[in-house]
């Protein structure tokens, strides 16, 4: 069912947003005209945000979602519904899952309604090129009959921040570190309002991975970003007075993983990834009381079949016949 009501960004007041959020929470499609208005509204908010967002505790950190809408609902059930819980999402909202459209629209609506309680930063899948390969573009065309919604959403990707810092102690990013970046100031001066480059510091922040046994920097098997070792993580934390680096980007079967004597934490929030990996997911809960201690996680499983619903079977593409 398509929700047909439409309003411009200036007309999207709290009551309008509440109504749209209620619709979006049911995993119902919102019409293209309304999506355009939502994108315009969230753009007005994101354009004012810095490359590095400053966040206060308490906040709950979420890793990759990848269009698994019903598992996002499970995440909210476990972690608390907005605005009762403050959330920092580390990117990769779309691709691979069945409901990338509904997932990203809901997160944009929540950002519009609660801009100080929802923080969205960019992942490597918030990219025009990547989403044309891994599902988001095709899903938009299938559900809306054209690529216009994809175009509106990918324009918003360019405005997402690149990193966040919690209480001046935790550095949060989608992927990892860059040999080109020693201090936060070097992130602050980047021009982020572009398509994700194939190389360079912005690319590295979204694509890099920690690697045990790596000294300094290594070549990434992903073909973008770098592998970075514990020494690189230690130096970055020392240079910027950080306790820890929090990132997502890698599937972790247990939902989270501690690297380099807890200097780096991976958080993964898509349970049973791609509906077949069998992993659990996690969120990381950060408070003023626990930020200096070991990380605190809530682990959760995929939504049940009853709560998930099944995607409609699509016609088989001709090249498979």
From Swiss-Prot:
Catalyses which reaction(s): O-phospho-L-seryl-[protein] + H2O = L-seryl-[protein] + phosphate; O-phospho-L-threonyl-[protein] + H2O = L-threonyl-[protein] + phosphate
InterPro entries per record: Calcineurin-like_PHP_ApaH, Metallo-depent_PP-like, PPA2-like, Ser/Thr-sp_prot-phosphatase
Keywords noted in UniProt: Hydrolase, Manganese, Metal-binding, Protein phosphatase
Active site as annotated: 125 (proton donor)
One annotated GO biological process: double-strand break repair via homologous recombination
Presence of keyword Transferase: no
Pfam family, one: Metallophos
Manner of cofactor binding, per the entry note: Binds 2 manganese ions per subunit.
PROSITE patterns linked to this entry: SER_THR_PHOSPHATASE
Cofactor annotation: Mn(2+)
SUPFAM superfamilies: Metallo-dependent phosphatases
Chain sites annotated for binding Mn(2+) 2: 92, 124, 174, 249
Major enzyme class: hydrolase
Known EC number: 3.1.3.16
Residues binding Mn(2+) 1: 64, 66, 92
A single Gene Ontology CC term: cytoplasm
GO MF terms held by the record: metal ion binding; protein serine/threonine phosphatase activity
PANTHER family hit by this protein: SERINE/THREONINE-PROTEIN PHOSPHATASE PP2A-RELATED
Record function comment: Protein phosphatase which seems to be involved in larval development but not essential for embryogenesis.
Subunit structure: Serine/threonine-protein phosphatase 4 (PP4) occurs in different assemblies of the catalytic and one or more regulatory subunits.
Family: Belongs to the PPP phosphatase family. PP-4 (PP-X) subfamily.
Protein name as annotated: Serine/threonine-protein phosphatase 4 catalytic subunit 2
Gene designation per UniProt: pph-4.2
